[in-house]
């Protein structure tokens, strides 16, 4: 009978130079790694006979990954140029992205296209992601092999479902999104304690689970992409707005400041101009075209610092995100105006560094800083509401 985690067990056995016998039900799963030390048995009697030298066991047949064409292309998105640009920067630097806008503006449509901009999984990443998925859904390992994870849990998901748990702690959504994207739609509808539990994994790339029977650490290095309405009714200005500033601010306060600080970019996704959807529109850039720029920017980052900009720590930010003195003074004044924290300042610098890398620039210019500051929609919204209340 098949067991969860077979591909992980087989990989570790092969690494250590040992042989492993796996159930026939797990053959398709372990066949993906094509390991010489892996053998298949369909019954315990066959295992006993093999150990007694009376029966030979076969190696698993090599399994081909299920090929899937790109389903969501960036060229399908009409308008929303700033949203597309923000998605490119997010993919290039490994950043976290928050999309804010009324219902029907294309927030989910944009988010679903980020995987088409990301590089293919390396062998190591593919094994890591498959090992985690095998623990909860072994049947999907072959289908998802070498596919970058894109997890989109419902806002009713419990804390345990999100971060993992159980008597013997199993992986949650954040670990299933390892090496991929965790998409949270209707962000303020999630429980606040569930969202705040994501803060540490976002910083460290792992989650520590401690229960009576076991303590375990799962990898959880994912990109967080989230979408939300700007108010309870979906609008905060114009004829569609039916909320007072107090109601809107109370709605936004469901999200803690420290949690919002984890987003490197927050973009406003507005309603499209009247008539644009009925016009003949020239298709925009394809995902493949944008992906080329993303790959070039990532190559610069790994050549310079051996990691993506999103994962730079404080000393590395000082080393790789240097500014001219005049630009540093300008940025300081901007941060004071927006009321940003030190963490938000560091994330803004990392976004500017990514924009410079997309431009193939060795230095961060004022133009790069200004563009990075323009992706702080949540801060501008909060300032706008606070002014209305004073």
Which residues are covered by each model-predicted region?
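P-loop NTPase nucleotide-binding/switch module
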Residues: 55-89, 93, 123-174
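Walker B catalytic acidic pair
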Residues: 179, 185-187, 197
């Amino acid at each position: 009978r098949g067991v969860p985690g077979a591909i992980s067990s087989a990989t570790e056995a092969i690494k250590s130079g040992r042989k492993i016998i796996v159930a026939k039900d797990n053959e398709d799963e372990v066949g993906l790694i094509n390991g010489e030390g892996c053998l298949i048995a369909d019954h315990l009697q066959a295992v006993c006979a093999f150990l007694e030298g009376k029966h030979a066991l076969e190696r698993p047949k090599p399994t081909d990954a299920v090929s899937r064409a790109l389903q969501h292309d960036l060229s399908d998105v009409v308008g929303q140029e700033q949203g597309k640009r923000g998605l490119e920067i997010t993919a290039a630097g490994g950043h976290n992205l928050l999309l804010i806008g009324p219902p029907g503006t294309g927030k989910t449509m944009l988010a679903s296209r980020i995987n088409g901009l990301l590089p293919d999984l390396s062998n190591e990443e593919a094994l890591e992601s498959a090992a985690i998925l095998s623990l909860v859904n072994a049947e999907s390992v072959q289908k998802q092999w070498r596919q970058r994870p894109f997890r989109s849990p419902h806002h009713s998901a419990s804390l345990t479902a999100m971060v993992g748990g159980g008597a013997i702690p199993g992986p949650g959504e954040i670990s299933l999104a390892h090496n991929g994207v965790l998409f949270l739609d209707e962000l303020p509808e999630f429980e606040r304690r569930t969202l705040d539990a994501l803060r540490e994994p976002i910083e460290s790339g792992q989650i520590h689970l401690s229960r009576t029977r076991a303590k375990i650490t799962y990898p959880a290095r994912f990109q967080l992409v989230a979408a939300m309405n700007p108010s309870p009714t979906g609008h905060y200005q114009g004829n569609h707005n039916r909320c007072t500033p107090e109601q809107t601010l109370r709605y936004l306060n469901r999200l803690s400041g420290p949690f919002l600080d984890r987003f490197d970019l927050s973009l406003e996704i507005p309603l499209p101009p009247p008539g644009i959807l009925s016009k003949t529109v020239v298709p925009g850039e394809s995902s493949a075209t944008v992906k080329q720029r993303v790959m070039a920017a990532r190559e610069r980052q790994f050549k310079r610092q051996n990691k993506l900009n999103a994962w730079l720590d404080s000393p590395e930010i000082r080393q790789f995100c240097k500014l001219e003195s005049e630009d540093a003074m300008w940025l300081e004044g901007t941060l004071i105006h927006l009321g940003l924290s030190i963490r938000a300042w560091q994330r803004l610098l990392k976004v500017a560094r990514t924009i410079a890398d997309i431009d193939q620039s060795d230095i961060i210019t004022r133009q790069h800083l200004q563009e990075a500051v323009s992706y702080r929609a949540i801060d501008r919204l909060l300032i706008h509401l606070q002014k209305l209340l004073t």
